[in-house]
Amino acid sequence: MVSVFTYIARMPRVFCDRDEKAGKEFPMRELKTTEAVGKTLCQDITQIIKGEKKGPVFRKGHVIREEDVPVLLSVGKDHIYIWEEGEDTLHENDAAAMLYEMGRSENMHPSEVKEGKIEFIADCDGMLKIQSEKLFALNSFGQMMMATKKNHSFIKKGEAFAGTRIIPLSIEREKMEEVKKIAPEGGILQLLPFEKKKVGLISTGNEVFYKRIQDSFTPVVREKLSPYPVEVIGHVTCPDDVEQEKGAIQDFLRQGADLVICMGGMSVDPDDRTPLAIRLSTEEVVSYGAPVLPGSMFMLAYAKGKVPVLGLPGSIMFCPTTVFDLVLPRIMAGDIVKKEEIDALGEGGLL
């Protein structure tokens, strides 16, 4: 893991003007821009040109020159802050570094500090897992923030999946030491690498088995698996027969499959046998049914050795985003899914 302090070791510190609640003066001064030549900027100065640019025109630590004054005035900075050192406060860069340390774990590194913000960058493809209570506690602490992609998201290598900063230009050192107690060892955010998995695919239904219709389900599932490190070790088609479906599941498990996916036959129709076949082939049924549309007839079970066996309803092949897309990153990262976590998908589950 790369420590963010590597990136800011040479950066000078900046401090807030005043903490209104505490009534404390911080060693930072406001000056007219026209009087600030030779002084040091205590914050990045952002320039926004519609359709062209949004970014710092001057960085923290820049010593203002005579020719810089018109540029500062053009971006609306008639007054600026200059800094002086202090012992009881932390510059926003240093505070952001501390927040990053609270969030970080393996498989990630910090971005360069920019405008007081540090981003979390993925070192590999993986699934983001968040300690939500700790994240909430941090964001409730006041004067600081950490924003993330959604929990259990698919994250690509090189992607920024979170960002953190304090809100003011500086903050009391004591307050930052206090917030560190939420996660003294870090780890609010985890990036679980995707595991290489052997996958068995089972198509079900008389209409497919007897070739009355073309199988349009399997290509969709293969496409959804394609971003992950998988090896499809086989694909079989079964009629609507419990024993044949159960036998196909067990055959794949004996072959060492790390994941078995059953496609179709998941409704309450009299011909649909897949839920029973999954029950008879596994040790634990987590859920038959999920509060998600499309995909409410989804089934998740675990066979011996915590091998997931999925039952996918027909809506998976027609809709671009379904319950399968919500659960698949967790399955591929080896993250065990619990019933209460399936139940919680109802909030935001209308896709």
PLM region descriptions:
Residues 5, 23-115:
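Short, low-complexity N-terminal leaders and the immediately following helix N-cap/first helix
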Residues 7, 17-19:
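Intrinsic-disorder-associated, low-complexity terminal segments enriched in Asp/Asn/His/Tyr and depleted
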Residues 34-38, 56, 110-113, 153-155, ...:
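Solvent-exposed alpha-helices and their adjacent loops that cap or buttress functional pockets
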Residues 59, 65, 150, 154-159, ...:
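Residue-level recognition of short, solvent-exposed, well-ordered loop/turn junctions
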Residues 86-194:
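Extended, charged alpha/beta regions that create polyanion-binding interfaces
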Residues 186-240:
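Glycine-rich phosphate/diphosphate-binding loop of Rossmann-like nucleotide-binding domains
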Residues 206, 233-351:
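Short glycine/threonine-rich loop/turn motifs
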